[in-house]
Amino acid sequence: MSEKPKYYITTAIAYTSGKPHIGNTYEIVLADAIARYKRSQGYDVFFQTGTDEHGQKIELKAEEAGITPKEFVDKVSGEIKRIWDLMDTSYDKFIRTTDEDHEKQVKKIFKKLYDKGDIYKGHYEGMYCTPCESFFTESQLVDGKCPDCGRPVQPAKEEAYFFKMSKYADRLIEHINTHPEFIQPVSRKNEMMNNFLLPGLQDLCVSRTSFKWGIPVDFDPKHVVYVWLDALTNYITGIGYDAEGNSTEQFNKLWPADLHLIGKDIIRFHTIYWPIFLMALDLPLPKQVFGHPWLLQGDGKMSKSKGNVLYADERSEERRVGK
């Protein structure tokens, strides 16, 4: 009897800055529908989701709450998992970026890329958006504010490690051009090519010293690994990747991922940063990254700051009561 074909599907890991709203829940439910369909078609499906638990925003939220960052993320991650379970989603793995095995591999990955010459130490000076955890140049701002979320930005200057993005840019462009299915829908591919890749990539900041809640850089512990090199690698650490060459049978079976299902607001990180990290690690790229649209409420994106948020668990309870 022939072995079932594998299908590895992931969602973006949810950021633990607060309770997820129904727009966040949309993604896990959509991924669950795909996973269930693939199982019905005879695939051996592995469905991974989880929580992204480091960063300055969480450090500040924990301070406001009067608890440690770990206590804060334990509470929020537990709430996210509770809601995902309430939605009866059939995930196989719920990874947390505070998991010991994930943190261990992130340290190894950072060191491997540093030893290879892809990461170097420098200084960052520019504008920083704390909610988005992103750096921007003055020219990238829109009306002096964050181009992604529209919130105010603050000047930032600090020592940091950087990843040489431009080293792999041509190779990524070639991959995108020869694999039309890689970025979907096509409008997202055009956006990435025209707005980021073709104009040229700047080197990427991959460490911070202005806050402490993160994975320390082993050989320079005043630095913590910056969000994307930590968060994105969950897709490989969660299935047993080892940067020293001792990856598990599960990793060798499942990677590359068949589908990364993500929101359109983080398509750049998954179709530029992530594949370049994988190239540097000599790993194959995911087969497809799909950037789904937002779930809108009223005249725009659902947002806690706009006060237009609906919560999946509350709506679910209303439906049960109304039966």
PLM-predicted stretches and their roles:
Residues 2-49, 101-105, 155-323:
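Structured secondary-structure scaffolds
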Residues 43-44, 67, 89, 118:
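Short glycine/serine/threonine/alanine-rich loop segments
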Residues 51-57:
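Short, charge-patterned binding micro-sites
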Residues 61-74:
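A charged helix-plus-loop insertion that forms the helical arch/lid used to bind
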Residues 72-128:
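A broadly conserved sequence feature marking short terminus-proximal activation segments
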Residues 116-169, 173:
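Cys/His-rich short segments
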